[in-house]
A protein has these predicted regions:
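Bacterial Sec-dependent N-terminal signal peptides
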Residues: 1-25
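Conserved N-terminal/central alpha/beta ligand/cofactor-binding core
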Residues: 210-211, 216-288, 333, 361-369
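Aromatic pocket-lining residues of Rossmann-like dinucleotide-binding sites
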Residues: 205
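Flavin (FAD/FMN)-binding glycine-rich loop and adjacent Rossmann-like elements that form
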Residues: 176-183, 224, 285, 293-296, ...
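N-terminal Rossmann-fold NAD(P) dinucleotide-binding loop
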Residues: 198
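Beta1/beta-strand and adjacent pyrophosphate-binding region of the FAD-binding site
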Residues: 183-195
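Extracytoplasmic
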Residues: 25-182
Length: 597
């Protein structure tokens, strides 16, 4: 063999060796929400846009939950380093409250997880694998909100990226996800958000013959009225009693298990419509517009799986947070306007009602909870990590005024911080109450882990509903929603009395007569095929104070559903219903009040 041939052979051997080494450096990413057995862990998709993914939450109210488990296929035998993406949600000079461990083939990995602040990868330990498929489990150690986003098995020394676009791209690569959904489905109307407003819109449109996609990121419908959050519905039916009575609630105490019966009624009634295509446990993650028209909404299952691109000539944003509008470039507002912008003063309450200068303060979010009285006493563990919030406050139940908002916190971007703050308030206040012997037999029965939001983004329509509209009390030519409920705006009690906990609010009630909301507040002024209904409708901060309750937002949804039917009939957008077909639309709305349940 000549020198040149020997060199070629040497380099070929070296390249093959390197190729083999590279192929052996392999990693497997397992999304925790995709575990086949969730055990007592819950899928929490509330904060995907901030931290990157749904995650598993060990919401045991102080009692460790059953293990989550799955099978993991590994590409080669050998040693693997195991990482978990997690977070210590209450860092401080105490043991982290959400601690857990990873088990592989029944063996507990050495490192306790959930101990470092902020979302990041924590090293669980190293394993030796001599089989293609291994059993993996998450073992909760506390019952206090441990959380796991994902596990990563790697036979290299790499550390996965922590957050942001680097993590998103890395995650997409590891999961081999396509750049865009490979499945497309087309409907007459796509409704994103299955609260009372979204359900009412879907029913109204379906009854008019439209094919409707209803996308909702929870296993049950109703939003704040669902059995998962348990707020009763307030407001009047307006002209839509037949539809709204199918999906509303009795006036049970907030947090009551009676919400479960109303949940069953709601789910059954929506599922009766064959042309409502229900996508429960699906979360929208992207929308795009072109020429001021929403082109599509992309959504995926909250427990993992193939995504779908939803197309339609019409879309309804009833997400509460205005996500479809936000992604597609719709104009929106957030926070409190200056008192001078719309003339919304209530002199008696000054800055607490409407500020001199605009700010980021909004009505806050709540977490409802309840206790039961058992036959025997049961201790509740010490929660030192909660006491900085609860301080000396004692309670054995929560109500609507357990609410948190702060000018430096954004109700969407800081949602997880706000939720966790409320959990600290609950656990700490209950611990304090348990120190009283009279409360020895009290036990936590139910604590929601889902934020009940009141206010965040408000999409802007052709008409912005304000306090002035309430004071005027005049009907519009396109009045489709009516209400008699007082305008109530919330503020934190600490603003009046520094001795009060920061998680309790107070409401200011402005008594009023009947007022009306025009159809023009229910479609975007710059995205020409986008409706909105619910608390993200077109209004000012004070204007939201009355009609944010759920029978009223349900009226909005029903009005949108009927408008969508005429949009289809004439091949026009939402605005043209007002400019070209208003009489026919209002006649259709008017007929609904005589169509009793």
């Amino acid at each position: 063999m000549g020198v040149q041939s020997r060199k070629r052979s040497y380099f070929l051997t070296l390249m093959l060796a390197c190729s083999g080494w590279i192929s052996a450096q392999q990693g497997v990413l397992i999304e925790a929400e995709s575990f086949t057995e969730k055990g007592g862990w819950l899928v929490d998709p509330q904060f995907v846009e901030q931290m990157g993914s749904p995650y598993l939450l060990a919401h045991g109210m102080g009692v460790p939950v059953a293990n989550a488990a799955t099978k993991v296929s590994l590409p080669v035998e050998g040693n693997y380093r195991v990482w978990a993406r997690t977070k210590n949600w209450a860092p401080g000079n105490w043991a982290a409250p959400g601690r857990f461990r990873v088990l592989v083939e029944g063996d507990t990995l050495p490192n306790v997880l959930g101990i470092h602040p902020d979302w990041n990868w924590e090293y669980a330990g190293e394993i030796s694998v001599n089989k293609a498929v291994v059993a993996v489990a998450l073992a909760d150690l506390t019952g206090f909100e441990g959380r796991c986003d994902a596990l990563y098995f790697t036979n290299s020394r790499e550390t996965p990226p922590a957050s942001g676009s680097d993590l998103a791209g890395w995650r997409k690569s590891k999961l081999q996800e396509p750049l865009a959904p490979e499945i497309t489905q087309t409907f007459d109307l796509v409704v994103v958000g299955g609260g009372i407003a979204g359900c009412a819109a879907a029913i109204a449109a379906a009854e008019q013959g439209l094919q409707v996609a209803l996308i909702h990121d929870r296993p049950v419908l109703g939003g704040n009225a669902s059995s998962e959050i348990r707020v009763h519905t307030l407001g009047i039916y307006g002209k839509f009693e037949r539809i709204l009575s199918k999906i509303d609630t009795e006036h049970y105490p907030n947090g009551s298990p009676d919400a479960i019966l109303d949940q069953q009624k709601r789910d059954e009634n929506v599922k009766r419509y064959p042309n409502i295509h229900l996508f429960l446990n699906w979360r929208a993650f992207h929308a795009a517009s072109q020429d001021n028209l929403v082109q599509f909404v992309d959504a995926r299952p909250t427990s993992g799986g193939e995504s779908i691109r939803f197309k339609a000539p019409l879309f309804l944003d009833s997400t509460g947070d205005g996500w479809i509008g936000y992604w597609s470039g719709a104009e929106y507002s957030y926070g409190r306007e200056s008192v001078y912008q719309y003339g919304e003063a209530w002199e008696q309450w000054g800055e607490l009602w409407s500020p001199e200068e605009p700010d980021n303060a909004v009505m806050g979010s709540s977490i409802l909870w309840r206790t039961k009285i058992a036959n025997t006493g049961k201790a509740f563990p010490a929660v030192p990590w909660a006491m900085e919030v609860a301080q000396s406050h004692e309670a054995t139940a929560g109500e609507w005024y357990w609410e948190f908002s702060r000018n430096d916190l954004h109700q969407i971007e800081d949602g997880e911080t706000i939720r966790d703050h409320m959990l600290k308030a609950i656990y700490g206040s209950f611990y304090n109450a348990k120190q009283n012997p009279a409360n020895a037999n009290y036990q936590l029965e139910w604590v929601s882990y889902l934020l009940g939001k009141r206010e965040s983004r408000r999409l802007i329509g052709d008409h912005i509903f304000t306090f002035r509209d309430v004071l005027d009390g005049a009907a519009f030519a396109d009045s489709v929603v009516m209400e008699v409920r007082e305008i109530d705006v919330h503020f934190q009690q600490q603003l009046q009395d520094e001795r009060q906990p920061d998680f309790l609010s107070k409401a200011l009630f402005y008594k009023t007569g009947k007022y009306y909301i025009p159809y023009r507040s229910l479609y975007s002024r710059n995205i020409n095929n986008l409706f909105m209904a619910g608390r993200n409708f077109s209004c000012s901060h004070v204007g939201l104070g009355g009609p944010r309750v759920m029978r009223t937002t349900g009226q909005m949804g029903a009005a949108v559903g009927y408008a969508a039917s005429l949009c289809k009939k004439y091949g026009v957008g939402p605005r043209e219903i007002y400019t070209q077909h208003l009489k026919e639309y209002m006649d259709l709305i008017e007929r609904q009040q005589w169509n009793r349940p």
